[in-house]
């Protein structure tokens, strides 16, 4: 399995504070069956530059790989970022923020409000050869309230990711299952930050998908993560536009 969204690199953001925590998170990922990991530390262009971020990220990665020597775990890693949305994003060297040598960019939106110019920015990114992957769509109230927003972004060429832990919350899981059936969710990841407050729960999330939507759907979403990691086109489900009927999205 592949984890495309995590905060495991030590001391770079609000994730793992040191290599000991990083190693514990990797151990749990390995036990869950994860073998491919994209390290997606937070990047905000209002707080740092791409150059400063990538230098800090590389230093943290080298620190972690040194600590991994002799450990009974083998992974394939890529360096990426969880990039906070801004209308001027396309003016940056966004290729350096993609997941390794892939064209995929993990993009985070504000949770408090829907930002302006999303469609335009998604289009501009794709004109640059970059494929946006929208992070943890379950965390945006405006998307949960109006799934046609996400439909428009996906129809325009973006992909969407959900956190495995969200599938363990019954009410939220019910909504996300609808999103998956509409073809609006493509990959599952952990967004892990720490062993206690936000541990990796990939195996539990996949088991929940199998239970509620069947093994075929769960396998497709897992396979999508593997394909994205290797810069391949995803096996996207047929897209269905959500419609409101008697006050409910169907």
Region annotations inferred by a language model:
Residues 1-74:
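An N-terminally biased module of ancient metal coordination in phosphate/nucleic-acid-related enzymes
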Residues 7-9, 42, 80-84, 110-112, ...:
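Active-site beta-loop-alpha junctions enriched in small/polar residues
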Residues 30, 126, 180-181:
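Non-catalytic positions within long, well-ordered alpha-helices that form the structural scaffold/packing
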Residues 48-161, 236-250:
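Extended substrate/RNA-proximal surfaces in nucleic-acid metabolism proteins
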Residues 48-57, 64-65, 71-76, 197-224:
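Short acidic, glycine/proline-enriched helix-loop-strand junctions
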Residues 184-200:
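Short acidic/histidine-rich active-site segments
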Residues 206-250:
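Mid-to-C-terminal alpha-helical segments outside catalytic/metal-binding sites
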């Amino acid at each position: 399995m592949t984890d495309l969204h995590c905060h495991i690199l030590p001391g770079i953001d609000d994730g793992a504070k040191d290599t000991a925590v990083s190693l514990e998170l990797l151990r749990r990922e390995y036990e869950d069956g994860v073998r491919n990991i994209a390290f997606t530390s937070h990047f905000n262009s209002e707080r740092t530059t791409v150059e400063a971020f990538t230098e800090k990220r590389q230093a943290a990665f080298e620190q972690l790989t040194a600590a991994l020597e002799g450990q009974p775990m083998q992974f394939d890693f890529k360096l990426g970022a969880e990039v906070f949305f801004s209308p001027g994003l396309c003016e940056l060297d966004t290729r350096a923020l993609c997941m390794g040598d892939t064209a995929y960019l993990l993009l985070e939106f504000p949770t408090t409000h829907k930002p302006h110019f999303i469609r335009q920015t998604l289009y501009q990114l794709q004109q640059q050869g970059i494929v946006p992957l929208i992070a943890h769509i379950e965390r945006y109230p405006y998307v949960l309230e109006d799934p046609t927003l996400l439909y428009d972004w996906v129809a325009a060429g973006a992909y969407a990711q959900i956190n495995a832990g969200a599938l363990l919350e019954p009410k939220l899981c019910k909504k996300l299952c609808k999103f998956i059936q509409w073809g609006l969710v493509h990959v599952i990841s952990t967004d892990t930050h720490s062993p206690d407050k936000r541990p990796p729960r990939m195996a539990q999330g996949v088991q929940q998908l199998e239970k509620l939507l069947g093994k075929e759907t769960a396998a497709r979403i897992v396979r999508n993560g593997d394909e994205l990691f290797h810069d391949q086109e995803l096996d996207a489900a047929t897209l269905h536009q959500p419609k409101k009927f008697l006050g409910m999205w169907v």
